[in-house]
Amino acid sequence: MGLASTVSLALLGLCSLARAQTSAADAYVSAESPIAQAGILANIGPSGSKSHGAASGVIIASPSTSNPDYLYTWTRDAALVSRALVDEFIEGESSLQSVIDSYVSSQQKLQRVDNPSGSYTSGGLGEPKFNIDLTAFTGAWGRPQRDGPALRAITLITYGNHLLSSGNTSYVTDTIWPVVKADLDYVVSYWNQTGFDLWEEVSSSSFFTTAEQHTALRLGATFATAVGASASTYLTQADNVLCFLQSYWNSNGGYATANTGGGRSGIDANTVLTSIHTFDIEAGCDSVTFQPCSDRALSNLKVYVDSFRGLYSINPTGATDPILTGRYKEDVYYNGNPWYLTTFAVAEQLYDALNTWDKLGSLDVTSTSLAFFKQFDSSITAGTYASSTSEYATLTSAIRNWADGFLEVLADFTPADGGLTEQIDKSSGNPTSAADLTWSYASAITAFKARGGAIPASWGAAGLTVPATCSTGGGGGSGGDTVAVTLNVQATTVYGENIYVTGSVNQLANWSPDNAIALNADNYPTWSVTVNLPANTQIEYKYIRKNNGQVTWESDPNRSITTSASGSFTQNDTWR
């Protein structure tokens, strides 16, 4: 029996079905909130009860050391978890300030740890994970991952802006700004280069990464001005990134394509997480920035949820029932299960949308979002519905109940002690994969807060327009059309050794071994990477090995390819 069922069993017999559903969600929020909060704090060093050995301020992904081993700190996870804590601090949880300050200090140190992705000034900020004692993890991994610096910048700027409003300028300018500036400069330099996605599996351009990079640059420009620094570069590149962000939209399918590579459908929780983590209520239902109530984000949400119908035997079977969702339907990791954090994200997007409609006093139904709204009113047509209309009341009430339904199905599969793992077994319903996943706890907190009407700080999304002319210039891009080139190389390696590629164009780091592009070893001994390269261009390149700081180049001569005018192709090589 799930946690909420245990808590609210007596209540359910006293209420109508609709009220019982709400009571179940209420009970789950009430019971799980303190458990999730404690779960986060237990996973933060040095004094967290489940984070023994972690340095001060280090947020571990999970205390699990086997099947899987997640006893590391990921820049992405830590930034998202810290953002949840920062939002709570801003809302009045003053006891969290020391925890947040410790996180800031840990990131100061972590940025300067040399690692397989590079150093502080040569790409090392894109390293995805570190040991919990703030030393480099040197094993094979999907690196670099370029969302981490952007997410960390967003978290620290949000914290810094609040401190500035309270008059604490010296800490912001002396401590927070240098960390933020390094991350923003990394984004400027690398936003138009490929990297691994948030699931650490696909090396390409990623919707989530691009959106977070845009948010970081936009927020960073304002923050730079506030501390007396130059903002022009951040603003210029923010416009370019916003332009690139539009390219992910699949108008035929009605969803945002999660990755430009990977060979999957592109329907992915990546996109739902994008919507909630770039939420800015001041932007209303703007589709350019993929706001939660925008027609594109709502269409995308329906396509994403529907992709899991019939996939997991533990799920309800109704055509519009709230269900458990996973990362993407083709997932095979741990046999491909639903995840807590992805299902919480669905509910959170819906609550964010409801909060925005309440603020606006109306909602719009467009041809893009019509299929989403027809789930709740089959007779609804495109148009604007004021909050005074019966249609508005019908739709928003049904959508709130639907959002609560996702919490209720999560409650059914939350153990009685409230502990949240990474995944839920798709057949048995038992918790599986990493125990006490910090990101799972944070996703519960942010969904619950959104349900209660919490609104995160604005980041400047209101009123943005896509530039008439888009550029990939600045930060390693060369502009013009590109084609996706997959490079495969057969290479046997020793433990700790990784394969990279560099070459004669910016996208291949201009022959820089420090900034060379990492290949992944998912199909070892074949190492692979997909890179967007200039079209109709002759390009020279070589593979290199890196091991304990030592670089070994392939033998001469340089390899050479001539890219096509459009499309994509694969180049198969063997190390020499």
Swiss-Prot record:
Protein name: Glucoamylase ARB_02327-1
Keywords: Allergen, Carbohydrate metabolism, Disulfide bond, Glycoprotein, Glycosidase, Hydrolase, Polysaccharide degradation, Secreted, Signal
Active site residues according to the UniProt entry: D197 (proton acceptor), E200 (proton donor)
Listed EC numbers: 3.2.1.3
Single annotated GO MF: starch binding
Gene Ontology CC: extracellular region; fungal-type vacuole
Catalysed reactions, semicolon-separated: Hydrolysis of terminal (1->4)-linked alpha-D-glucose residues successively from non-reducing ends of the chains with release of beta-D-glucose
Protein's organism: Schizophyllum commune (strain H4-8 / FGSC 9210) (Split gill fungus)
Top-level lineage group: Eukaryota
